[in-house]
Amino acid sequence: MEKPRGVEETPSSEPMEEEEEDDDLELFGGYDSFRSYNSSAGSESSSYLEESSEAEHEDREAGELPTSPLHLLSPGTPRSLDGSGSEPAVCEMCGIVGTREAFFSKTKRFCSVSCSRSYSSNSKKASILARLQGKPPTKKAKVLHKAAWSAKIGAFLHSQGTGQLADGTPTGQDALVLGFDWGKFLKDHSYKAAPVSCFKHVPLYDQWEDVMKGMKVEVLNSDAVLPSRVYWIASVIQAAGYRVLLRYEGFENDASHDFWCNLGTVDVHPIGWCAINSKILVPPRTIHAKFTDWKGYLMKRLVGSRTLPVDFHIKMVESMKYPFRQGMRLEVVDKSQVSRTRMAVVDTVIGGRLRLLYEDGDSDDDFWCHMWSPLIHPVGWSRRVGHGIKLSERRSDMAHHPTFRKIYCDAVPYLFKKVRAVYTEGGWFEEGMKLEAIDPLNLGNICVATICKVLLDGYLMICVDGGPSTDGSDWFCYHASSHAIFPANFCQKNDIELTPPKGYEAHTFSWEAYLEKTKAKAAPSRLFNMDCPNHGFKVGMKLEAVDLMEPRLICVATVKRVVHRLLSIHFDGWDSEYDQWVDCESPDIYPVGWCELTGYQLQPPVATEPTTPLKAKEATKKKKKQFGKKRKRIPPAKTRPLRQGSKKALLEEDLQAAAKAPSEPAPDEIITVRVKEEHLDVATADKALSPELPVPVENIKQETDD
């Protein structure tokens, strides 16, 4: 039978390479089932990973791989970083980008001692392997698994990752145990999820249009009594983000055994995977007697059908690699005073989201954001553009914190999302001009605002008119190309309620009268970035969204309104006053199943049952705010998130509430836990079409009753 497209012959050296892999896996304390992932990738996966650095170079030359910060530089690139005079460098072992002066050894080839030793160890293994194969030794031995190792780490963490962050937030499988059942939620209410292709910052967004209804996959058979893991073919009935509703072949129109699955898991494979990896196809016990000729049945069902690309999981893992590493330093907005930045260190990277620790703060003084967030900048950005920064020395008591012990370089500018270039000729924003802007302290409001200061590189300091601060501490920095600022009368033209300055009524506010009274002028409409892509979002679509007032939380949410490229996000179970405006390309919204894919804790909708009224003192204590300003939220007692500063008090209240609660929850009750996090990497992957694969059915095995 013809071999499926994209499958290569296994190199003759594969047994020896597998032995080397087994040696490496001893790092995980003898975790045997990880080997199943290696075999599941197939022989073509092994050779792909071991030669990925060469293949990636060829693909980039052919224009097939997107440019990423890691691909912008090579170890010998003699370019200087922005105004710093330091040469950039790339670690030859892990690929991390940094400054040459901060790298290890005289040659500056590695970012740390561990990378240098790993490179040396792998080179020796490669040299020994070459001699055993009768090949002459070379001056520079090829490093075994150089590119594959991070992929294996990613797959291992994805399939078996457990644990907690320092703040107690569960990760990996620990987080999924506390997870939310998207499948039941969508099916019970007939909700529609936003497609993955709407989110440009998530894994494989540019290939998800190939995932369609009727597609065939090979999936783990959970209705079998055999001692080993067996598989069966299933059809995609419905797609919802990364999750799909599957039905085993043979059930035909019977939906009673349909089940939801995340396509990012390692138990879903393209047709032909079982044949390549000598896995057994066994029909579910429920229907095993329905047909006597399963081979013939599958031949009819599979001919001409579509399936996943052969390298689907390889590309998934590759797209979940991120350039930021623990210990990198950067500048981030000060959450206690948004008009300035502070120095911070990357503590954790999960799915492209960064947990940052302020250098002059406590161990729990953190800030969450995506690596493409406009709130973070390379070291030196504030000084260069004229933005305020808090100058303080690093706390001596933080010197022993694990993250601060790993500081080895500043995050280089190439790692940050680039802003649009601006041209100031022919008129530009001026100090005192009026406009409309999303209130950074209350993201559900679009307010009348003023340009307080014009910075360099197109950045503007904006303040909301009528704000409580008179010292400029509530000014906020927006770039001129930001989609959070709008020309005057934008809200009126799009039927959005504008929040007027203090002393004005929304229904009587007039821009003309206000400009005349304040003797100011409106910023010209031509200066604003009003481009609107065909983003694909529609009212009612479900997604996972960051609560920007408490950015460590990702919640179940709904697109409430679409105004050009502006989305009004409603958090399910919360009042409308907590809705937030975000851009359609915001890195703070994710497709259904993203948290499950990355191991981040998803916050379910708030329970709707009535709660006991809070005492005034308790209510005051439970209020929480984002940047220490206006925004306040009082979640119900059962679902409020744990805060580091009041763990003891909250724990006592939770124990009292648990004592009064019934021993078992109602069947349809949703129990929410306000914690969360994530794990892994992300980037964009090259586009691959879903091939029509031949039908490998020789290995179908009939299951018999014991």
From Swiss-Prot:
Xref: InterPro entries: Mbt (IPR004092), MBT_L3MBTL2_rpt1 (IPR047356), MBT_L3MBTL2_rpt2 (IPR047357), PcG_chromatin_remod_factors (IPR050548), Znf_FCS (IPR012313), Znf_FCS_sf (IPR038603)
Region (Disordered): 1-85, 606-669, 685-706
GO cellular component: nucleus
Post-translational modification Phosphothreonine, affected residues: T77
Residues that span the membrane, as ranges: none
MBT repeats by residue range: 180-284, 292-392, 398-501, 509-605
Single GO BP term: negative regulation of DNA-templated transcription
One MF annotation (Gene Ontology) recorded for this entry: histone H4K20me2 reader activity
List of residues binding Zn(2+): C91, C94, C111, C115
Entry keyword Glycosyltransferase: no
Record's compositionally biased regions (Basic residues): 620-635
Composition bias type Basic and acidic residues, residue spans: 54-63
Major site of localization recorded for this protein: nucleus
Keyword tags: Chromatin regulator, Isopeptide bond, Metal-binding, Nucleus, Phosphoprotein, Repeat, Transcription, Transcription regulation, Ubl conjugation, Zinc, Zinc-finger
Cross-link (Glycyl lysine isopeptide (Lys-Gly) (interchain with G-Cter in SUMO2)): K406, K648, K660, K676, K701
Covalent cross-link Glycyl lysine isopeptide (Lys-Gly) (interchain with G-Cter in SUMO1) as placed by the record, residue numbers: K701
Zinc finger (FCS-type): 82-117
Biased composition (Low complexity): 39-50
Biased composition, class Acidic residues, residue ranges: 15-26
PTM-bearing positions, type Phosphoserine: S13, S68, S339, S690
Gene3D superfamilies per record: 2.30.30.140, 3.30.60.160
Location of the protein in the cell: Nucleus
Stated role: Putative Polycomb group (PcG) protein. PcG proteins maintain the transcriptionally repressive state of genes, probably via a modification of chromatin, rendering it heritably changed in its expressibility. Its association with a chromatin-remodeling complex suggests that it may contribute to prevent expression of genes that trigger the cell into mitosis. Binds to monomethylated and dimethylated 'Lys-20' on histone H4. Binds histone H3 peptides that are monomethylated or dimethylated on 'Lys-4', 'Lys-9' or 'Lys-27'.
Subunit architecture: Part of the E2F6.com-1 complex in G0 phase composed of E2F6, MGA, MAX, TFDP1, CBX3, BAT8, EUHMTASE1, RING1, RNF2, MBLR, BAT8 and YAF2.
UniProt protein name: Lethal(3)malignant brain tumor-like protein 2
Lineage: Eukaryota, Metazoa, Chordata, Craniata, Vertebrata
Name of the gene encoding the protein in the UniProt record: L3MBTL2
